[in-house]
Amino acid sequence: MHCLKAVVKGKVQGVYFRDFTRTQAIRLGLCGYAQNLESGTDVEVIAEGDKDILLEFLKLLRSGPPHAEVQEVEVSWSSTNGNYGDFHIKY
């Protein structure tokens, strides 16, 4: 199992980006979380699952929901032991 950490930059706060992320993650069977960062413009996403599914998820993060304007996605990978039981939004 792999872990994807993505910091999504651009107009991604206040446009339902975290809700979109959660919906797509659940649809793909991924676990982890999405949270706004204190920068006021970035969202951090942690997702665990099979690498092929995580790559599909990453494509979705790069496009985002209709009102989002994703400018950049910083990505890092690691292995995981399944730290999360579901996918949720952190507040």
UniProtKB/Swiss-Prot annotation:
Keyword Iron: no
Entry annotation: catalytic residues: 18, 36
Entries under InterPro entries matching the protein: Acylphosphatase, Acylphosphatase-like_dom, Acylphosphatase-like_dom_sf, Acylphosphatase_CS
Keyword Membrane: no
GO function terms (MF aspect): acylphosphatase activity
Alphabetical list of Pfam families matching this protein: Acylphosphatase
Reactions catalysed: an acyl phosphate + H2O = a carboxylate + phosphate + H(+)
E.C. designation(s): 3.6.1.7
Disulfide bonds: none
Keyword list, A-Z: Hydrolase
Family to which the UniProt record says this protein belongs: Belongs to the acylphosphatase family.
This protein's name: Acylphosphatase
